[in-house]
Amino acid sequence: MVSLLSFFLLLLVPIFFLLIFTKKIKESKQNLPPGPAKLPIIGNLHQLQGLLHKCLHDLSKKHGPVMHLRLGFAPMVVISSSEAAEEALKTHDLECCSRPITMASRVFSRNGKDIGFGVYGDEWRELRKLSVREFFSVKKVQSFKYIREEENDLMIKKLKELASKQSPVDLSKILFGLTASIIFRTAFGQSFFDNKHVDQESIKELMFESLSNMTFRFSDFFPTAGLKWFIGFVSGQHKRLYNVFNRVDTFFNHIVDDHHSKKATQDRPDMVDAILDMIDNEQQYASFKLTVDHLKGVLSNIYHAGIDTSAITLIWAMAELVRNPRVMKKAQDEIRTCIGIKQEGRIMEEDLDKLQYLKLVVKETLRLHPAAPLLLPRETMADIKIQGYDIPQKRALLVNAWSIGRDPESWKNPEEFNPERFIDCPVDYKGHSFELLPFGSGRRICPGIAMAIATIELGLLNLLYFFDWNMPEKKKDMDMEEAGDLTVDKKVPLELLPVIRISL
């Protein structure tokens, strides 16, 4: 075994140096973007310790908004300005709308059978159209209005019970429960709080494990076939990745099986029912046949991107409001003046139409705290130029939305939480304005914007209407430290003291 391993390593060494030599000759003839000096073998990996979006932000301040890195053997271009992002996501959208294939993306997308990680092509386009029609369209989002209202009612009842004890509550946990319960009912046709297959804590733990395993693996930085496999095997990354994937897949199998068994008695068919009908009827597209793997791929996208991101945005919004009493008071004054006393005790989504300042608070939260600070990486499908630099074909592109949202060239006092900056400001979060990219832009823009905004705005409205919020007595300052991988949450859970409004 030892001699075989030694032979394998001996074989890889000349291949490794040949690849480096060939790549250096080719790159020397191109006008690549600037970047930090690269070490042999590891490239710039040693400079990316800590939160990746902050490391890249700091490097971009020195090397510019279009920056070239080499992570191991894998070259990457990082974009950190609105102008460069517009060139990549609008001018060259078609040439930049594929995804790099990593070990995690291949496994979790079931070899490209999803809309998050799948490479660009006919199969991806048809699957995205299907997902939008059955779940993400404005009409579908409106049809789920009653679910969002019911789940917010349940959250408020729970908070009132906790508030009566006059002790701090873990608002992070409660808000995760809110967004999870909405997604479980709308997408999966199941209850989050009373799920027979997994308990609440297991679902949350599994999601965070999945998200941490979806990032680049160390083996992805050495894409030579034999070396990539060897690193993944020896480090145990392969084993951990497949272990998490199999647990997620088991959960989705339960969802599919439940829908098959309840098909005849289902009062309100959901997205899973609709896609299962197409599969049973052997729906055939020009380039592929719809399968259960496609369904589970879409379910995985909704599960991983729909629950965590909305909860994180609500958590950051509440943290910023408590830190900024002026903004909190202005938001609550608007809400309580416009809505008045609700005799039936329920907030309706129609109430949001009256609340312009609340919408500004959400915008400002998305600017300062995008739930996914780095947009999912894209891959160029042709040679292009961005800001005058050569970007070769099959080059990974990473857009730092966090950095763009804090760019002093676009935003006055960018570190300040100031919703008023959006008054009479045409910048929006729908992919048309490149100064604000929490959902991305172009062909790869997040299809769940309408669902996310409806969930966030209604949740925030309920929290601010029914309660006043204070810091726990023992805490003087709000800890705003970040933590995470694909998504970035508060490192310390948000604990606040809710006070029920006397007038209600």
From Swiss-Prot:
Main localization of the protein described in the UniProt heading: membrane
Documented EC number(s): 1.14.-.-
Gene Ontology cellular component terms for the protein in this record: membrane
This protein's UniProt keywords: Heme, Iron, Membrane, Metal-binding, Monooxygenase, Oxidoreductase, Transmembrane, Transmembrane helix
Gene3D superfamilies: Cytochrome P450
Keyword Nucleotide-binding carried by entry: no
Name this protein carries in UniProt: Cytochrome P450 71B4
Organism of derivation: Arabidopsis thaliana (Mouse-ear cress)
Gene name linked to the record: CYP71B4
